[in-house]
């Protein structure tokens, strides 16, 4: 198909990719009737990213709510009034205009615009493979096209890619992390800035230096010892000295308290520090111990009934010590990925709970009425059947409650089978999301490590002129490490059946 250049202009560069244009109907451009093109009064030229297209106002009038449809109306109004300054002006819809040649300029992607032209021809929008979903969405939104206009053959793949791109928006997360990192590391204000900065690096960057790595290992050991000690304190073993366990508990709490206080003293914005989830977890890990001491010290003059109530409060507070396990999230990428996955998959988790609730309600009721007439049945009530249905649908099957009749066994078989099918659907989505979050965090950690190494190397070169290091090789190694992690991510996604997510 031949594109008609405007008068006084050279024809478009033949190097442009015209293969995709050959499939476009000529009605989008200047209509060709009996070998004679329409007069230029019925058309105008748009220049998108350096590529020029002559469009028909009649074809664009079918889409009045799009940007080009509005531009066609404005251009027609300008011609009738004979002035570019008509209200509204074409400059409100384009980046620049040439009224002499009737040409309007758009600083947008010419490659994406070819799909927009195809939409004007057929009324259907297809997703281009070369751009990411969010970039393509920005383009069609600029041209005033709703993403719901995407054809059914591309709609499912597009929305899956869009969801994954929004979830793993690496650039935005990196910028937020860097801005937060810079705000917390502003040690120029306050006392002892050098000491605070070094102490902060040891506390928050386990891989920054040898002291930081040693501190990270010791912190993990204290968390593990504290958890084991908490378990041993609940067991009445004759060979264990309770006083020794209490001393060990005091030592662990002292370490956790000192670690939290040092972090609190190092930061500049302490209110923001207390609002962060890892710091809230650290605070909840040590507060029950001190609250327990306070309650026990104030209960000396209480009556017997009040002492029993205080004892219940103390037991509840001691249960909160299990939150110390979450402190390992500072040192474990997997735990952080799990937290991100639960946060991002709340809809899938809610859907999973809904499916389980419906199945448990139905099968427990049917099983109860099928087994209630049997002597010495274990299905004594519907709540007991709830427990049986829960263990059956989750394929745990403790065996403490089991059916005896043939009808009950058939219902149990249907319950187990439905549980397998119900759990398989959301868990597959959650598993894919967890894998994506895990490898994204790995990429971020690798990027942070390489950035810190480059900064340190550059600083050493600036201070010592005898050091000879090829920064290009260092940068190449960092890129290769991130590509290796990205390759593992793609392989994991491909093995889980998520090939369509990557492009």
UniProtKB/Swiss-Prot annotation:
Question: What Pfam family is a match, any one?
Answer: Ion_trans
**Where does the protein end up?**
Cell membrane
Side Extracellular, residues: 235-246, 301-312
Residue spans crossing the bilayer: 214-234, 247-267, 280-300, 313-334, 349-369, 410-430
As one GO molecular function, the record gives: potassium channel regulator activity
Q: Where is the motif Selectivity filter annotated in this sequence? A: 395-400
> Which ranges does the record list as Cytoplasmic topological domains?
1-213, 268-279, 335-348, 431-503
* Gene3D superfamilies the record matches: 1.10.287.70, Potassium Channel Kv1.1, Chain A, Voltage-gated potassium channels. Chain C
What's the domain remark here?
The segment S4 is probably the voltage-sensor and is characterized by a series of positively charged amino acids at every third position.
UniProt lists the family membership as follows: Belongs to the potassium channel family. V (TC 1.A.1.2) subfamily. Kv8.1/KCNV1 sub-subfamily.
What protein am I looking at?
Potassium voltage-gated channel subfamily V member 1
**Source organism:** Bos taurus (Bovine)
